Amino acid sequence: MAVASKKIPAPDEVRIKTALLSVSDKSGIVELARHLNDRGVRLVSTGGTHKALADAGLPVSDVSELTGFPEIMDGRVKTLHPGVHGGLLAIRDDAEHAGAMSAHGITAIDLAVINLYPFEEVRAKGGDYPTTVENIDIGGPAMIRASAKNHAYVTVVTDPADYPLLLEEIAGGTTRYAFRQKMAAKAYARTAAYDAAISNWFAEVLDTPMPRHRVIGGVLKEEMRYGENPHQKAGFYVTGDKRPGVATAALLQGKQLSYNNINDTDAAFELVAEFLPEKAPACAIIKHANPCGVATAPSLAEAYRRALACDSTSAFGGIIALNQELDAATAEEIVKLFTEVIIAPSVSDEAKAIIARKPNLRLLATGGLPDPRTPGLTAKTVAGGLLVQTRDDGMIEDIELKVVTKRTPTAQELEDMKFAFKVAKHVKSNAVVYAKGGQTAGIGAGQMSRVDSARIAAIKAEEAAKALGLAEPLTRGSAVASEAFLPFADGLLSAIAAGATAVIQPGGSMRDEEVIAAADEHNVAMVFTGMRHFRH
């Protein structure tokens, strides 16, 4: 049953007389406290915060002066007391509440400056179980929620970045209701995200990827000019996951990334991470979250040139992802064509100077590559719900391939098959990818019919051959990958017509035998992976 409200109007302005300060992140707290003290505000604090303020020479009362009870159990119990929560929750204009405060000697707290134990940071750094549990804050969230609930009378500040706003607000000694309400909303968002991080950590510990309640929390990193289209609003929220990528990257030059830039850059970097840098340099060029070209080569510059050769028209205004440090030679190649974003693990000083010639080109350094095998979750909103699944961490290297045709693929065909299947994993379904010699020869993406994807990829390959002045398209003698099974022989026959000599696909169609027979008829080698890579 809902709790009834006393419906007492909230005052617009509340004078700040007593402030409770209890922070884990102590940045700016001494300066804030000094300003409050100069305004005649009584300072009350706890533990390490009390010590920091006292060491700075500020007059500060220990919270035990409000509670009449010392901190116990290594500080686990210090603010969970009516002397604190009564001071935060009391409705000042209610006679009954005022009487209770007077009877029990409870001091009204007008300002609560609180931030929490660094649970998210400890978790991200891989803290052991006892340490992580010890960094679950109890008293902090309780005080924040109490203060936020009673924002009619109490101002709560949870983010050091808001200290300047607070000082500006209380220049006259009071806070307005609108400000208190805004800070309360931010406070509840903070405790919600904090609890979400704890809940999700327990789900990981207990190996429960789909718990009964799934909470997804994030912190606004930047508000964007617009979303996918100019009439849509957008923001970029970060979860605290340290997986190298666009969320953790340093922007070395260029203007703010757009919504589409972030989406495409993430897709590009996840794709190029499939190729181990110690084996060979790799480059992926992305447009609308689909690859235009992907290649490996002895040098990074050559990998870029080979990736570009697959579809230089579509690559215009695209995203370039590299699996090794961006060097000067590669940078010189990239600046020849209009590019939106470059993302790489690192960037040499020489490359930075070259890219600086294009000041609008966004340059990101991540400090590392994401591990495709690392477990994780992806989420997608639908009307009235949220679709959550584990990340597609399937790797071709971990699959035992099954040769289903009379002819076994050659060693080179097998390498081309694996390369093509890696790329197909990152192409929107229906996906068909031709590859030859560590280079995509043609990519067909996002078609409702798989045979159309095969045809489009072949057409792209023919166009690329003409642009490069080649006698024949690179699909001649190539391997072709399909991210899902070939439902009919028509897709296979289209690939054969384009010149493919080897096919890799998951298998599992009701017409597998028909498709295998068509491959045998044309002396084409085919392997089944048993793993599908749908991407929508």
Curated annotation (Swiss-Prot):
Q: Tell me, what is one Gene Ontology molecular-function annotation carried by this entry?
A: IMP cyclohydrolase activity
Q: Which pathway or pathways does this protein act in?
A: Purine metabolism; IMP biosynthesis via de novo pathway; 5-formamido-1-(5-phospho-D-ribosyl)imidazole-4-carboxamide from 5-amino-1-(5-phospho-D-ribosyl)imidazole-4-carboxamide (10-formyl THF route): step 1/1; Purine metabolism; IMP biosynthesis via de novo pathway; IMP from 5-formamido-1-(5-phospho-D-ribosyl)imidazole-4-carboxamide: step 1/1
The alphabetized list of GO BP terms reads:
'de novo' IMP biosynthetic process
Q: Which family does it belong to?
A: Belongs to the PurH family.
The reaction(s) annotated as catalysed by this protein in its Swiss-Prot or TrEMBL entry are: (6R)-10-formyltetrahydrofolate + 5-amino-1-(5-phospho-beta-D-ribosyl)imidazole-4-carboxamide = 5-formamido-1-(5-phospho-D-ribosyl)imidazole-4-carboxamide + (6S)-5,6,7,8-tetrahydrofolate; IMP + H2O = 5-formamido-1-(5-phospho-D-ribosyl)imidazole-4-carboxamide
SMART domains reported in the protein's UniProt record: AICARFT_IMPCHas (SM00798), MGS (SM00851)
A GO CC term attached to the entry: cytosol
UniProt source species: Sinorhizobium medicae (strain WSM419) (Ensifer medicae)
Return the domain comment text from this UniProt entry. Answer: The IMP cyclohydrolase activity resides in the N-terminal region.
Q: Could you confirm whether the keyword Flavoprotein appears in this record?
A: no
Q: What is its EC number?
A: 2.1.2.3, 3.5.4.10
Limits of the MGS-like domain: 8-158
User: What PROSITE patterns does this protein map onto?
Assistant: MGS
The protein in question is named Bifunctional purine biosynthesis protein PurH
Q: Which UniProt keywords apply?
A: Hydrolase, Multifunctional enzyme, Purine biosynthesis, Transferase
